[in-house]
Amino acid sequence: MAKVVAVTGATGFVGSHLVHRLAREGWSVRILARRMPQAALVPDAIIDVVIGGLGDARALRRLVRGADAVIHVAGIVKARHRADFQVANVEGTRLVLAAVSEAAPMARFIHISSLAAREPHLSPYA
């Protein structure tokens, strides 16, 4: 039986490439998406699409429950207000970690950041 990996940010540039790679390597993939992605973007290995966002604790628990690994790719590097970075990147990550702690405490957790985190001229995200 294939191991299950839960992925946030799966419909973005990095996340979509990651999901396809995981599928090629034999993982069963469960993704979080704000809305149902186009069928062409979804590899056959996706076993479930959990509709919700980083602020939806219930959806995050559904996403990670029973996962062997959780890869958190979701985040923002552009926002209208500085506080939006805090909500999406800090609070969203905190909620993902809380869901893992509650619903998949043995899962490996990988957090993928952005080049913008170390290049202040690219984004206020840094």
Predicted region positions:
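Nucleotide donor/acceptor-binding cores
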Residues: 2-3, 107
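N-terminal Rossmann NAD(P)H-binding glycine-rich loop of SDR-like oxidoreductase domains
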Residues: 3-27
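SDR active-site strand-loop-helix element
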Residues: 8, 32, 70-74, 109-115
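Conserved glycine-rich Rossmann-like NAD(P)H-binding loop of the short-chain dehydrogenase/reductase
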Residues: 27-35
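Residue-level detector of anion-binding/catalytic polar loops
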Residues: 28, 69, 106
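NAD(P)H-binding glycine-rich loop region in Rossmannoid oxidoreductase-like domains
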Residues: 37-41, 47-94, 101, 115-123
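A short helix->loop->beta-strand "cap" motif at the edges of active sites that frequently abuts
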Residues: 100-108
